[in-house]
Amino acid sequence: IFDECLKYGIKPLVTLSHYETPVGLVNKWGSWSDSRTIDCFLRYVKSVGERYKDKVEYWLTFNEINCIDFSGWVAAGIPNQNPQTIADAAKNQLIASAKSVITLHNINPNNKVGNMIGYGIKYPNTCHPNDILKTWEEANEDYFYCDVQARGYYPRYKLKEYERNGVVFSLNDKEKEILKSGTV
């Protein structure tokens, strides 16, 4: 397919993960809620990146990464919507995304790696400040993933949300550096 696209001047764009978490990883480790899944994903990324390094230079790491918040099974192979599990899985996918960016740039410095979210435009019901704030908070649920992938750090509003909801969250120095170095 790539050869045919290139023959007609079409540059392929590859999405590395599009809702297909292997059931073996779900059964063995609980999928993306376990950080060991990152290494499995990176072996896959390296394999695909090496194989198609002369044919593909446009990549997306995860399709609609933010969908993990409301559809954990589809987006990350998580059979529940427990906030702690979702936060852990999101962290692992975001670290995997950053490591994928680094890996793909090491394979071919010309690679361009991006991200995408599933997003529907949001409007406040009225111009009342409470409606506007609610709309902003809902938008941040989606923007959070872009913020981390593009800026390389967890935004304060998400850390405060975790704190309010009793989610235990931390990043060690190595993880912080990975997020910072692996921006899209």
Predicted regions and their residues:
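Active-site region of glycoside hydrolase catalytic domains
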Residues: 2-184
